[in-house]
């Protein structure tokens, strides 16, 4: 869409994967007893309690290879799976159990991994949102912000950190910082 308006910004697309485990202690990882969590280190891992699936979800954050929407494979990366499985066995051993399934997804990230939530400077009636690989958790808030931008051109929230005009989005060879 941005190309239609004469814009090209720096985005990196990676193929990520998540695994769902059927823990024999599933009640300990239910929504009522277990939080969404992030292991903020290098590498970074995150997980969700059992909700909607018959098991807890775990993944490495930005552990996948660069790709494009056209060239992605949907194939599970055994090395990425092993890193996640090893982490789970070491840090949450009672969450480990039979694998329900592993699936792939795409992250689309600006170099600074911050969201883009703004209108286009020369087209204030065009709202832009880029999720930076972790937007799904904020979908309802993004919907509210985008509807405010579409209806009034402004939001009740401070969107200055997420401006479309950030220099790093247009830098020729930006330093990529993908740590959350």
Label each region the model flagged.
Residues 1-122:
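Active-site substrate-recognition segment that forms the wall
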Residues 86-180:
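C-terminal catalytic lobe of FAD-dependent flavoproteins
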């Amino acid at each position: 869409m941005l190309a239609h308006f004469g814009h090209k910004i720096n985005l990196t697309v990676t193929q990520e994967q998540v695994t769902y485990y059927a823990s024999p202690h599933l009640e300990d990882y239910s929504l009522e007893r277990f939080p969404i969590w992030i292991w903020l280190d290098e590498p970074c891992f995150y997980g969700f309690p059992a909700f909607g699936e018959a098991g807890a979800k775990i993944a490495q954050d930005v552990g996948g290879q660069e790709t494009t929407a056209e060239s992605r494979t949907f194939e599970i990366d055994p090395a990425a799976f092993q890193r996640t499985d090893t982490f789970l066995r070491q840090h949450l051993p009672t969450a480990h159990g039979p694998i329900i399934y592993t699936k792939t997804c795409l992250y689309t990230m600006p170099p600074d991994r911050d969201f883009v939530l703004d209108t286009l400077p020369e087209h204030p009636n065009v709202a832009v949102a880029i999720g930076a690989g972790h937007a799904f958790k904020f979908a309802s808030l993004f919907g509210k912000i985008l509807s405010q931008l579409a209806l009034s051109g402004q939001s009740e929230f401070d969107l200055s950190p997420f401006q479309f005009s950030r220099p790093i989005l247009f830098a020729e060879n930006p330093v990529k910082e993908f740590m959350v």
